[in-house]
Amino acid sequence: MLRLFYFSAIIASVILNFVGIIMNLFITVVNCKTWVKSHRISSSDRILFSLGITRFLMLGLFLVNTIYFVSSNTERSVYLSAFFVLCFMFLDSSSLWFVTLLNILYCVKITNFQHSVFLLLKRNISPKIPRLLLACVLISAFTTCLYITLSQASPFPELVTTRNNTSFNINEGILSLVVSLVLSSSLQFIINVTSASLLIHSLRRHIQKMQKNATGFWNPQTEAHVGAMKLMVYFLILYIPYSVATLVQYLPFYAGMDMGTKSICLIFATLYSPGHSVLIIITHPKLKTTAKKILCFKK
């Protein structure tokens, strides 16, 4: 029964990856067409374009790795497995930093705080987006290189695993992976929670101000607050289980866990990227309108 559940989780994982690939390809193509047509692109769309490309490559790599792992009857070289792991770590870290940068941009642009720091960020963050995107890539490259450096002290075994024989031995490399993940994800988590909290606080102040002035509080600014807040909250709901599941998958005792636990970890690990990509399309006016036209929902 548990084997059937695990097999179903693998099938669901493949389906979710296909959905994620299609969604991110859609995000990339729409923003690319807008960029080419108007010869300009907004700061948020520039981040979404970078995020779409990164997630498309990451999910494609994950899908290829899953298919290869399930279908291969031969032993897998440690170098090929290490290549998959390192590429996935770099792309995953880059995509998470891009989302963090997107949340920071929404927080700075939408909130109405009058603090000098916020006013300075409002004026200067948009022109700095290309450099900040490059910084995200460099940070991801640094954490990946840190993993490589630390893993040199505990090299991988020569061969990883056969389809029906031994399991992959990652006990020696677990410390380096945990350090890399914690260094990258903890700062991202703090920034995203802070951005969401500031946005919620700003929305509450805005509603109180509208009520005090005896005017309707549902206006374009309120709608922008709510839309960005929903996207951030849903991101955190998907991101927290994803981070835990991803970390558990690399723990030494993961290979000895029951099929049910492995299935749950697999589902949570693959649900985040496709789910958040769908949420981006739903909450982004241009992407939502284009998607409706494609699906023939527009009358």
UniProtKB/Swiss-Prot annotation:
InterPro entries referenced in this protein's UniProt entry, alphabetically: TAS2R (IPR007960), TAS2R4 (IPR030055)
Pfam families: TAS2R
Membrane topology listed for this record: Multi-pass membrane protein
Topological domains annotated Extracellular: 1-9, 68-81, 153-172, 252-262
Listed GO biological process terms: respiratory gaseous exchange by respiratory system
Superkingdom of the organism of origin: Eukaryota
Family: Belongs to the G-protein coupled receptor T2R family.
This protein's name: Taste receptor type 2 member 4
Record organism: Pan paniscus (Pygmy chimpanzee)
